[in-house]
Amino acid sequence: GLINLYAIDDAHEREAKGMYDDFLLGGTDSEMVNDSLGPKVQLYLNSPDFVTGDLVNETPRLTVLLEDADGINTVGNGIGHDLIAVIDGEASMTYTLNDYYVSDLGDYTRGTVSYVLPELTEGKHSLVFRAGDMMNYATTVAVDLEVVKGLRPRILEVGTTHSPAYE
């Protein structure tokens, strides 16, 4: 590689220039283990208890837990390099979710996608989610869901916490 440098010191009316060419940009880690597997994917809508075919509201929250030793690919650099959700196989209902991926703190191998789906019509739908790792191995997961208009969330537990603030 080559980097050309230029600097100016307005206070002393001086200029400087230079170059640096002793670096490599790109390449491959020779010690990397190629597992040839896509990311582990756990997907649910609204609740971790979701199973394929469950009932959901019109705007369910899609949550996807991802893990891969090579890291999760969110580069968005062409086909297969995005986190994608597709509803009912429709191109018009394809959502790129790269911007909704958050890595676990200090861990490039794991993270979560959290995205509220746009309003869906009442009835049965399918959702396909695709994720790839940094070695371009992909995993695709499909689930079915049934949208029920006006469905209210299930409240599983209500708790209170003492406020630490006082006068």
Where are these regions (language model features)?
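Short, surface-exposed ligand- or partner-binding patches at beta-edge/loop junctions that are enriched
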Residues: G1-N4
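Long, low-complexity serine/threonine/glycine- and acidic-rich segments characteristic of extracellular
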Residues: Y6, H12-G26, Q42-D49, T63-K149
